[in-house]
């Protein structure tokens, strides 16, 4: 029945009549607000309107606006009562989306790569500084220069995770390994702190050896690769011909 006023008449068996005026009040236009979407761990504010007295379910009560932090998708219902005692309800759904979690190494050398992964598929990767490191669509991080970079993995819901990666500089070698006569030596130098164990190595010690301070001693004709590794595990090479 729609809101308004009417008169109800009662007539008894003797033809006697009595009239009663009745007013029908409309229901309050209660609103719980629009449905909302949040990421796991976030809060959202619910604001109801449309009635003199408002009360939420789920243990919220008369608090309005109300801040809630659901751990899973939840429907909240608000009950509104107007000044005439008429009652109406409305609902709002708060969808809780899962936040991805990145895993993988936190260190990479310049010109080196590491692969990061997420526990949820379907997101996109991004680097906040391509001058320090780039990241591919599959999570492969390539070091560019020394520094720290934040790698972010974002879902279509907007939920994301950020992972900090440190890029270490690649050592720079100095010295000449071409045309060294047998019986002579050449000392290579490198930038950075040497690794604590075997910082200098030769790929073929029958051709040339190298000691812990970078002194290369040729032994026979041929080619070998001299490698220096720094304390961060980053390495550079030079060829002895």
Please give the residue ranges for each predicted region:
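C-terminal edge beta-strand
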Residues: 18-25, 88-96, 161-167, 236-241
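Solvent-exposed segments in extracellular or luminal domains encompassing
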Residues: 1-7, 64-77, 138-148, 214-223
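Surface-exposed, flexible coil segments in extracellular/virion-facing regions
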Residues: 51-70, 127-140, 202-215
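Extracellular acidic loop/turn motifs
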Residues: 53-55, 122-125, 192-199
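Short, solvent-exposed loop/linker segments at the N-terminal edge
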Residues: 36-42, 106-112, 177-184
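Proline-enriched interdomain boundary motifs that mark the N-terminal boundary
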Residues: 27-35, 97-105, 133, 169-177, ...
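A short beta-strand segment in extracellular, disulfide-stabilized domains
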Residues: 42-50, 111-120, 184-192
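Conserved structural position at the C-terminal beta-strand
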Residues: 10-12, 80, 153-155, 228-230
């Amino acid at each position: 029945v729609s809101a308004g006023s009417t008169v109800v008449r009662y007539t008894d068996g003797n033809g006697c009549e009595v009239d009663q005026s009745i007013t029908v009040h409309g229901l309050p236009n209660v609103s719980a607000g629009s449905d909302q979407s949040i990421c796991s761990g976030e809060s959202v504010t619910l604001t109801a309107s449309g009635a003199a007295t408002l009360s939420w379910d789920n243990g919220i009560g008369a608090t309005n606006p109300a801040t809630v932090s659901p751990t899973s998708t939840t429907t909240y219902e608000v009950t509104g009562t107007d000044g005439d005692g008429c009652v109406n309800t409305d609902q709002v759904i708060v969808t809780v989306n899962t936040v991805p979690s990145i895993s993988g190494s936190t260190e990479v050398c310049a010109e080196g790569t590491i692969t990061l992964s997420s526990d949820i598929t379907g997101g996109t990767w991004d680097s906040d500084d391509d001058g320090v490191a780039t990241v591919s669509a599959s999570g492969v991080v390539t070091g560019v220069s020394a520094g720290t970079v934040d790698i972010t993995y974002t879902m279509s819901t907007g939920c994301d995770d950020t992972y900090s990666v440190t890029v270490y500089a690649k050592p720079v070698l100095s010295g000449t390994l071409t045309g060294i006569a047998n019986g002579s030596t050449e000392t290579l130098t490198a930038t950075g702190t040497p690794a604590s164990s075997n910082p200098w190595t030769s790929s073929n010690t029958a051709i040339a050896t190298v000691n812990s301070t970078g002194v290369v001693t040729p032994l026979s004709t041929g080619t070998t690769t001299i490698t220096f590794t720094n304390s961060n595990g980053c390495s550079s090479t030079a060829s002895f011909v």
